[in-house]
């Protein structure tokens, strides 16, 4: 299952590149033809793919909020993880894999063909106008010590045993978690990739003058933070879009 989830994250890198966004607005990208989703629309929501194992704890809560937000204007149907995994693996096999047999490089064309194959299985009659591939992805936030900003949000860095002078150690880029939505039309043509910042997964300590970074056990516990991030990622699907220049 981990391999299946990892394959799904390739599209975001294809569209936005490998560099991560460090500004305070979501780094959204749209196809030239995308003008937003007419309301109401029928949306097929695929399972959330966590970028890392530690993000799996947030899948249930974020899924609930995502469905709730989308249902304010659209009809939403979900797909179970077992059904999705089986269909996606079959789609990959049908196109001969999505990596080059000679170089091992990711094959963008085959990836998009696999998406089209997948939707022929999951959306054969074209009943759904939009199909969403959601993921919990690692991003880079711009930290100024006490706070970090990325993908439309500002979050406080959690620290223990630090005075103001020592915050300078965490100026610059720090890891963050965002919700990424890759949206396609019913035939598998890419429409948009949108983001919303969720949480900072780490907290920081200094003991015996040694700085340490720790993974939060409860990184997805702040429901207000999750709600804000989900709402930001969903905005391009709830009305007309303002495209980044």
Residue ranges and their predicted role:
Residues 1-8:
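Bacterial N-terminal signal peptides that target proteins for export
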Residues 15-17:
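C-terminal motif of bacterial Sec signal peptides marking the signal peptidase cleavage site
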Residues 19-40, 126, 138-245:
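C-terminal/domain-edge helix-coil "capping" segments
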Residues 38-53, 94-99, 213-214:
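Acidic/histidine-rich, surface-exposed loop or edge segments in extracytoplasmic proteins
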Residues 42-47, 131-135, 180-182:
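Soluble periplasmic/extracytoplasmic beta-strand elements of cell-envelope proteins
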Residues 52-141, 184-190:
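N-terminal segment of the mature soluble domain
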């Amino acid at each position: 299952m981990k391999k299946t989830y990892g394959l799904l994250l390739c599209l975001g890198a294809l569209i936005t590149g490998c560099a991560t966004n460090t500004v305070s607005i979501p780094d959204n990208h749209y196809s030239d033809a995308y003008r937003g989703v007419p309301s109401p629309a029928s949306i097929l929501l695929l399972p959330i793919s966590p970028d890392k194992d530690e993000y799996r704890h947030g899948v249930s809560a974020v899924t609930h909020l995502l469905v709730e937000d989308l249902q304010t204007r659209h009809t939403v149907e979900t797909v179970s993880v077992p059904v999705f995994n089986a269909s996606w693996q079959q789609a990959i096999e049908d196109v001969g894999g999505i990596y080059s047999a000679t170089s091992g490089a990711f094959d963008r064309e085959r990836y998009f063909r696999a998406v089209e194959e997948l939707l022929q299985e999951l959306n054969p009659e074209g009943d759904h106008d939009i199909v969403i591939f959601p993921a919990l992805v690692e991003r880079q936030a711009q930290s100024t010590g006490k706070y970090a900003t990325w993908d439309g949000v500002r979050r406080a860095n959690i620290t223990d045993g630090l005075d103001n002078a020592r915050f300078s150690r965490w100026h610059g880029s720090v890891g963050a978690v965002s919700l990424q939505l890759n949206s396609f039309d019913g035939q598998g043509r890419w429409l948009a990739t949108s983001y919303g910042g969720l949480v900072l997964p780490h907290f920081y300590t200094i003991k015996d003058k040694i700085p340490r970074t720790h993974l939060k056990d409860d990184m997805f516990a702040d429901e207000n933070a999750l709600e804000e991030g989900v709402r930001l990622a969903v905005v391009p699907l709830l009305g007309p879009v303002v495209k980044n220049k």
